Amino acid sequence: MSDRVTITQEDQVAIVTLSRPEKRNALDLEMIEAIVAAGQELAKRKDIRAVVLTGDGEAFCAGLDLAAMPLIAQAAMSDGGFTQRTHGNSNLFQAVAMVWAELPQPVIAAVHGFSFGGGFQLMLGADIRIADPNTKFSVMEGRWGLVPDMGGMVLMRRLAREDVIRKITYTAQVFSSDDALAWGFVTELSAAPLEAAKALAQEIAGKSPDAVRSAKKLISDTELTGWHETLIEESKAQEALVGQKNQMEAVMAGMQKRPAKYSD
């Protein structure tokens, strides 16, 4: 497995750590593939009863590494584009979050620092999210002329009101842990989120694994009805945006730290 992601085990709990701290665990292609591979590996592990998902260094995940944008654009223009289903009902990028939503075992995200863009969607793939009170969140894609396309349109809708989703998606504004808690994106706040997540994971691991897995499947099956179609529509929307004039202007303006000049 790539050194971008590590898996350690404490009793029957797996600790999955994003390990690119010098980039605030930003998502490049190697990181994306490593996250998905970690989920696929743990899905086969009957000895693992709960999973903790965390990030090394000062952030959980700062979102997409802009240096990877050319590869993203290339994927959009390839045969099948984003709508090609390569990981069950998801494409590779959606699988970053959906692999955890679909994991048989419960997943607890321990979140700190920043949870932006793809990192925010990754966090939403967890069953439970425990955040440091000082964490900052954002659906960052709007800043780059894109839409959330890593399962966000499925995962946000099971947690928050539609008007809240619209607000944070349209504006790409940064919001606080208090807002994230009030809006339903975060389960609880803790000054020591990793320790709290590990303690909860150990508690869950002490319950019947058959009952816990069955409960997760039952909850997911009822709350994610119709999500297959939503993932396809999410991919179509992103595919239509990537590489277009306004999307490229959003990226260039962001990198050059100037106001964007969009065409109608």
PLM feature spans:
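Conserved CoA-thioester-binding segment of acyl-CoA-metabolizing enzymes
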Residues: 1-56
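CoA-thioester-processing core
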Residues: 95-104, 110, 116-170, 183, ...
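Terminal low-complexity tails and localization/encapsulation signals of metabolic enzymes
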Residues: 252-264
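Glycine- (often His-adjacent) and acidic-residue-rich active-site loop
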Residues: 55-99, 226
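Glycine-rich phosphate-binding loop at the start of an alpha helix
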Residues: 63, 90, 94, 117, ...
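C-terminal long alpha-helix characteristic of the crotonase
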Residues: 21, 130-135, 177, 183-232, ...
